[in-house]
């Protein structure tokens, strides 16, 4: 499949994805939000701790 055929097929693929996808309910959305925020906070804390350790080493 060449590039032009793939580009022509994109709207059809997007339409299929949108028809299959469904909007999450409030509980599912809040769970995803909490998990995302916890992971972001963890990664930020980890990055800060690494930066702090490296600042004292160097």
Curated annotation (Swiss-Prot):
Keywords: Cell membrane, Membrane, Protein transport, Translocation, Transmembrane, Transmembrane helix, Transport. The keyword Membrane applies. The keyword Membrane applies. It is found in: Cell membrane. GO terms for cellular component: plasma membrane. The chain crosses the membrane at residues 38-58. One of its GO terms (molecular function) is protein transmembrane transporter activity. It is a single-pass membrane protein. Component of the Sec protein translocase complex. Heterotrimer consisting of SecY (alpha), SecG (beta) and SecE (gamma) subunits. The heterotrimers can form oligomers, although 1 heterotrimer is thought to be able to translocate proteins. Interacts with the ribosome. May interact with SecDF, and other proteins may be involved. Belongs to the SecE/SEC61-gamma family. This is Protein translocase subunit SecE. It comes from Acidianus ambivalens. The lineage of its organism: Archaea, Thermoproteota, Thermoprotei, Sulfolobales, Sulfolobaceae.
């Amino acid at each position: 499949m060449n590039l032009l055929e793939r580009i022509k097929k994109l709207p059809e693929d997007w339409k299929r994805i949108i028809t299959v996808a469904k909007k999450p309910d409030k509980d599912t959305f809040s769970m995803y939000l909490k998990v995302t925020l916890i992971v972001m906070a963890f990664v930020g804390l980890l990055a800060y701790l690494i930066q702090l350790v490296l600042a004292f080493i160097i």
